[in-house]
Amino acid sequence: MIMTNEATTPSGQPLGISHKPSKSGAMFTKFKAENKPAFIGYLPYGFPNPDVSLDAFKTMVEHGVDAVEIGLPYSDPVMDGPVIQAAASIALNNGETIKRVFEAVETVANAGGVPLIMSYWNLVYHYGVERFARDFENAGGAGLITPDLIPDEAGEWIEASDRHGLDRIFLVSPDSSTERLETVARNARGFVYAAARMGVTGERATIDASPELLVERTRQAGAENVCVGIGVSTAEQGAKVGSYADGVIVGSALVHTLLADDNKTARDPKEGLKLLAAKSEELAEGIHNAR
């Protein structure tokens, strides 16, 4: 069983069909032909301020990031670690709202990257699901990562994303049952996000074998593309994960470059962008040469 553009209810009944191509799916098709994984990088929009965040997204793409996961800052980020929470807090203090994030989507698309948004579902729901899908598509968006939305409760989003040709990226974890993996694979579009462990995000000193097993189980459940988010912070770690995953997702290590040494305030923008470019290149080298 493979992932198609056909959405279903959690029980497997067809819900709708999108005839628009998957932008992230096209990226994976290209990279599989080249036998290399994709590099997906995360930064919250509005951090350290709106203008610099746009420069940061462009810098990432120019220095090796293939798809940019644009985070929507949220006041209660239960799954984010201290580094991302600090960045999101700065962005929220800048008054960032969901309306303005589409400017970041356009920036990534114009730079040649694949624009993704990561958002807690409450933000999308209150903005309006259909309105969000329409505005996201019009800005050139590819797909939405929803860490707290499961397929069983995603009927409205599945229908809206089909109408607008947007990818649905659901999460799985090592604790996910086979039934849950199958439900996610059946309803996902673009790729499945394999969270290496449940709990908050953050950089890891070492990486064990559990993510590789999760990728294998998720593929067996029917997912065509599986990307891993595990706290990768070095080129060596990126290469290790990239040897078996279709994509490597990096967040905290990139956010860290724009934070000051106290991990609470923003670094000087010029210095931060320079560090971000260097870190992006370092990770891209490891990830893209993993095989």
From Swiss-Prot:
Active site as annotated: E69 (proton acceptor), D80 (proton acceptor)
Keyword Disulfide bond (UniProt): no
A Pfam family that the UniProt record links to this protein: Trp_syntA
Record GO terms (molecular function): tryptophan synthase activity
Keyword vocabulary terms for this entry: Amino-acid biosynthesis, Aromatic amino acid biosynthesis, Lyase, Tryptophan biosynthesis
Enzymatic reactions: (1S,2R)-1-C-(indol-3-yl)glycerol 3-phosphate + L-serine = D-glyceraldehyde 3-phosphate + L-tryptophan + H2O
Pathway(s) per entry: Amino-acid biosynthesis; L-tryptophan biosynthesis; L-tryptophan from chorismate: step 5/5
PANTHER family: TRYPTOPHAN SYNTHASE ALPHA CHAIN, CHLOROPLASTIC, TRYPTOPHAN SYNTHASE, ALPHA CHAIN
Record-linked HAMAP family: Trp_synth_alpha (MF_00131)
Functional summary from the UniProt entry: The alpha subunit is responsible for the aldol cleavage of indoleglycerol phosphate to indole and glyceraldehyde 3-phosphate.
Name of the molecule in the record: Tryptophan synthase alpha chain
Gene expressing this chain: trpA
